[in-house]
From Swiss-Prot:
Keywords: Cell cycle, Cell division, Cyclin. It comes from Oryza sativa subsp. japonica. GO terms for cellular component: cyclin-dependent protein kinase holoenzyme complex; cytoplasm; nucleus. Residues 50-80 are annotated as: Disordered. This is Cyclin-A3-1. One of its GO terms (molecular function) is cyclin-dependent protein serine/threonine kinase regulator activity. Belongs to the cyclin family. Cyclin AB subfamily. InterPro entries: Cyclin (IPR039361), Cyclin-like_dom (IPR013763), Cyclin-like_sf (IPR036915), Cyclin_C-dom (IPR004367), Cyclin_N (IPR006671), Cyclins_cyclin-box (IPR048258). GO terms for biological process: cell division; G1/S transition of mitotic cell cycle.
Length: 373
């Protein structure tokens, strides 16, 4: 098994970022309409099975909106709250209906109860106990590729997190061979897109993105299998769910500018998706640890944990130490991973280049001590 993986890993990996760098060196114009990404690292997939990233189709609602342009406008209903946060009893929280201040405590309690339900949790050791032909390395390669797919189709981040959750839960219950792993990935993303997106990509888009390696019927069948195995329990909270709740509390002073902190948290949270070792951790634990490491990166001279964060997250820094260490190691790439999609994504200017920022090599032990009351 290890030999096959090493042989596959030795094959040249053609990603969008790599293609862009090659184009810059050779000064060869690359057509912008058809960008290709390879998933060749999956054993048994040859370099001929390149993945074509198809430009996102125009929103389906465009024509409908135009046809009714002349009709008199009706008062729009108040927007549904898109962000769940924990709000203090202050004037700012009470005055903003988007923050759901009256219900924040109930929402938080409900999400905490959901995340610990066995039916919504993957097995901590499914690679060792359930899978025969799939390894943790293959899982990481698949997730890295799905990050690029989500970027190409401009999917919201919740879709990516749900996709990985579905994959882990499915693999915890059913063994599959490596040839079906990419099929599982696109089918899981198809389901997550239907759950989260306003205009999700259709089945044909996901077939095309695999260079038609799989037929429409195969994707639909795998979609059905996923739904049945997961018993149609598709709405579980993810790391992103809790991250939204914790970020506002971590912006309690001007030391942590709003956008850099938010982007840094998003970057670290996506890195955690690559790590099989994070599967065993609760989403709220990962989210709290991500906030700790993000604040440490942006200001290493100040204890990144605070009484307010401890109260909002429900965790002391000492309780998060193992997860914080894991996230910290991922950020420093201490395992020497070659999976670069997330790092390249967050190098972009629109994300403030947060992936180029590094935390201190060692986290001071004093930062894990209990805070004084």
């Amino acid at each position: 098994m290890a030999g096959k993986e090493n042989a596959a890993a030795a094959q040249p990996r053609l990603t969008r970022a790599a293609a862009k760098r090659a184009a810059a060196v050779t000064a060869v114009a690359v057509a912008a309409k058809r960008k290709r990404v390879a998933l060749s690292e999956l054993p048994t997939l040859s370099n001929n099975n390149a993945v074509v990233l198809k430009p996102q189709p125009a929103p389906r609602g465009g024509k409908r909106a135009a046809s009714h342009a002349a009709e008199p406008k009706k008062p729009a209903p108040p927007p549904a709250p898109a962000v769940v946060v924990v709000v203090d009893d202050d004037e700012e929280g009470e005055g903003d209906p988007q923050l759901c201040a009256p219900y924040a405590s109930d929402i938080n309690s409900y999400l905490r109860s959901m995340e610990v339900q066995a039916k919504r949790r993957p097995a901590a050791d499914y690679i060792e106990t359930v899978q025969v032909d799939v390894t943790a390395n293959m899982r990481g390669i698949l997730v890295d590729w799905l990050v690029e797919v989500a970027e190409e189709y401009k999917l919201v981040s919740d879709t990516l997190y749900l996709t990985v959750s579905y994959i882990d839960r499915f693999l915890s219950a059913k063994s599959i061979n490596r040839q079906k792993l990419q099929l599982l990935g696109v089918s899981a993303m198809l389901i997550a897109s239907k759950y989260e997106e306003i205009s999700p990509p259709n089945v044909e888009d996901f077939c095309y993105i695999t260079d038609n390696t799989y037929m429409k019927q195969e994707v639909v069948k795998m979609e059905r299998d996923i739904l049945n195995v997961l018993k149609f329990e598709m709405g579980n909270p993810t790391t992103k769910t809790f991250l939204r709740m914790f970020i506002r509390s971590s912006q309690e002073d001007d030391k942590y500018p709003s956008l850099p902190l938010e982007f840094m948290c998003s970057y670290l949270a996506e890195l955690s998706l690559l790590e099989y070792g994070c599967v065993r951790l609760l989403p709220s634990v990962v989210a709290a640890s991500v906030v700790f490491v993000a604040r440490l990166t942006l200001d290493s001279d100040t204890n990144p944990w605070s009484k307010k964060l401890q109260e909002v997250t429900g965790y002391r820094a000492s309780e998060l130490k193992d997860c914080i260490t894991c996230i910290h190691d991922l950020q420093l790439n201490r395992k020497g991973s070659s999976l670069m999609a997330i790092r390249d994504k967050y190098k972009q200017h629109r994300f403030k280049g947060v992936s180029t920022l590094l935390p201190p090599v060692e986290i001071p032990a004093s930062y894990f001590e209990d805070l004084n009351e």
